[in-house]
């Protein structure tokens, strides 16, 4: 990655609305079927700038694709623990605590608003 590319990634990371990401993760944990609505709300790993968020979203998407009706913190941790580098990223960012806080404190509301904010950047 060139210096210019690195600077662009850092800029994108600062612009991305982290609260919206947290609300999106809350919605997915409470209602994973939202990931099946690709026509109205297409979400991909590339929508997330930070590796930490990419790891979490990738695990959620894999769990949904494997048929999970619900997704909780233990499921996500278990999914990521199979892969050394992503699991290190997850743990270095206190992933379990981060997701527990999201699930316990953020209601899965206003998804459309947060989705639009995520897609804006």
Stretches with model-predicted labels:
Residues 1-121:
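Noncatalytic partner-interaction/assembly domains of nucleic-acid and motor enzyme complexes
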């Amino acid at each position: 990655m060139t210096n210019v590319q690195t600077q662009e990634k850092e800029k994108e990371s600062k612009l991305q609305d982290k609260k919206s990401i947290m609300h999106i993760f809350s919605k997915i944990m409470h209602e994973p079927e939202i990931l099946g609505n690709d026509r109205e709300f297409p979400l991909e790993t590339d929508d997330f700038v930070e590796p930490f968020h990419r790891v979490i979203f990738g695990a959620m998407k894999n769990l949904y694709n494997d048929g999970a009706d619900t997704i909780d913190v233990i499921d996500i941790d278990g999914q990521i623990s199979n892969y050394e580098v992503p699991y290190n990223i997850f743990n270095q960012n206190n992933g379990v605590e981060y997701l527990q806080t999201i699930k316990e404190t953020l209601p899965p509301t206003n998804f459309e608003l947060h989705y639009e904010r995520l897609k804006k950047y």
